[in-house]
Amino acid sequence: MPSELRFDGRVAVVTGAGRGIGRAYALLLAARGAHVVVNDLGSSTGGEGADAGPAAAVVEEITAAGGSAIPDTNDIAGVAGADALVGAALDRWGRIDALVNNAGIVRFAGLPDADAENLDAHLDVHVNGTFNTIRAAWPHFAERGYGRVVNTTSSGVLGLPVNLGYATAKGGIIGMTRSLATAGEPLGIRVNAIAPAASTRMGARKKGDDPEMDPALVAPMAAFLAHESCPVNGEVYTAGAGRFAKLFLATTPGHVQGAPTIEDVEAHWAQINDETGYTVPADLIDWSGEHLSHLDGS
């Protein structure tokens, strides 16, 4: 039997940890020995209002079980809130080792109903909030030569017509994750993402409706990505209902032709789309080398 993966002495910050999936993350990390900052603004699923109760309740659960945690209600959509959140970890324990960006909102709408306000609301929390917390924690990770970041994307990036703003924001998380991973690798910082699936209030389904979709079944993947033994960087994993899998971007071999015409594209459409022999680029440089390899005869 493998040895238990522990977080003793580590400090983890979890955003959106007052309910649902974030709560499951915080409880598991604390149970494995981490000091946890339980961040939650306490807003509605659409981002309205604030309530200190959810974060405080999770902290009570953790401490009652013998764990170590403090509540935090800063709004990470703003720079000041994200700075204060990271500052709370530093003030209490003098360090930050792992950051789990789980906070999010959902306002269902697709075109023609979705407007710029809807899009901006999703970007503010999902994209700006994730960026703000990472930016606040990054210097501390770099100084110690160690850091783990777990961002939250969604299977919605595969196509979610009823919530365009949400899917758009979650797509941005993938680009952010992969870019930060390349920057963090030489610094000892690993940045990955999780696409969770569980019954929560955000999905308009409460825990208990589907026992197999319990948020606790997602948490092991997030915890592993936040652990020092995590071997990957810049990757995305789906998690839910007890199933874990890798979600990745790939490119087909395609068709090579000098000075092509529109008609050439049509004529070779099947070859362009043939997924046989696809490759998975590690980053932009890797993709560029592959895409332009025909120019040097390789």
In which residue ranges do the predicted regions lie?
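The beta1-alpha1 cofactor-binding region of Rossmann-like NAD(H)/NADP(H)-dependent oxidoreductases
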Residues: 52-56, 73-84, 116
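C-terminal helical subdomain
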Residues: 193, 210-297
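Catalytic loop of short-chain dehydrogenase/reductase
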Residues: 150-172, 177-186, 195-211
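A short, exposed helix-loop element centered on a Lys and neighboring polar residues
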Residues: 134-135, 178
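Substrate-binding pocket helix/loop in short-chain dehydrogenase/reductase
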Residues: 62, 110-111, 118-120
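Canonical Rossmann dinucleotide-binding motif of NAD(H)/NADP(H)-dependent dehydrogenases/reductases
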Residues: 4-37
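A glycine-rich helix->loop->beta "capping" turn
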Residues: 7, 65-68, 88-101, 107, ...
